[in-house]
Amino acid sequence: MKLNVNLPHHPYDILIKKGSLSQAGSWLSQLWQPQRVVIVTDNRVARLYAEKVKLSLEAAGFETFVFDFLEGEASKNLKTVNKVYEFLVKVGLTRSDGIVALGGGVVGDLAGFAASTYMRGVHFVQIPTSLTAQVDSSIGGKTGVNTPWAKNMVGTFTQPDGVLIDPEVLHTLGQRELIEGMGEVVKYGLIEDKELWDELSEMDGSPESILEHAESIIYHSCDVKRKIVVEDELDNGVRLYLNFGHTIGHAIEATAGYGKVMHGEAVAIGMVQVSRVAEKKGLMPAGITENIIHMCQKFGLPVDYQPWNEAALYQALTHDKKARGNSIKLVLVPELGSASIHQIPLEEMKEFLKK
């Protein structure tokens, strides 16, 4: 299955194909001339897949190097980026060469940021290996790293030259890592894709059912995201819909300590919290919060988090990228399959943090 992200200045394809990881070289040779490439990955993915991808790239004529770092959200920072830069200099990567991001969301965001800033930008591609990355973070060109103040506070908008998705790699994910990816999938069903929501409703919620439906789930999610990205690449309008649950979710990730609560888990908690308060305020229809809770719990996603520190969460979300002066853009779901943006005073977010 193939989808096109038809941006006027930088169109690219998303290829979703079982077993495609071993064909990475032939895929990349359709995008780039044989050249020097660096695979950026983490130590866990490196053990599983780096050699397979490296051999495939070398067979296609690419001079290939591998850089890996310690897995996890705690590594997604400028210190790790500096280590990437050091490695790129060491192997002599030039502006005509490229970077292959092989891994989950942390790898994709960090490798993309390094690619977009090294020598003012080199080409890169995404080969996502986690469900979260396959359905969300590998598409759309958002790159970045965390700071002590906020998640993804430093970053760029830089589109990849292509995205290669092999659903079979999901079989090597741990159960928690697989399940957390469903946080983003549930979000897509809520904000845009009623057909996806119906498919999720028919599933039994087990990890086995996620793997069985993986291709369809990935396709629907990528299709929603690529349409929104084409309409609003730089996150000024409808692309904000993709942030449903993320305002509070990112605050949870930052205050808990990066990596303690996984991204998809934080999104699920954020969607439930914002919906619960919005429903009380009459901004979302009665009963929708229970629907969200039921769907999240069916797939094993958390819907609450302790300790819930309202003051710390509020302080974290004041650094949110959707904040504009003393207001913030909050995404809500007025009905299943659609989203809306509400600009509210930043101070009012305190109400959305109350239990």
Swiss-Prot record:
Transmembrane parts of this sequence: none
Pfam families assigned: DHQ_synthase, DHQS_C
GO molecular function, one term: 3-dehydroquinate synthase activity
Cofactor note text: Binds 1 divalent metal cation per subunit. Can use either Co(2+) or Zn(2+).
Obligatory cofactor(s): Co(2+); Zn(2+); NAD(+)
GO cellular component, one term: cytoplasm
EC class name: lyase
CDD domains on file: DHQS (cd08195)
Pathway: Metabolic intermediate biosynthesis; chorismate biosynthesis; chorismate from D-erythrose 4-phosphate and phosphoenolpyruvate: step 2/7
Positions bound to NAD(+): 71-76, 105-109, 129-130, 142, 151
Biological role: Catalyzes the conversion of 3-deoxy-D-arabino-heptulosonate 7-phosphate (DAHP) to dehydroquinate (DHQ).
Family listed: Belongs to the sugar phosphate cyclases superfamily. Dehydroquinate synthase family.
Name of this protein: 3-dehydroquinate synthase
Organism (species): Streptococcus sanguinis (strain SK36)
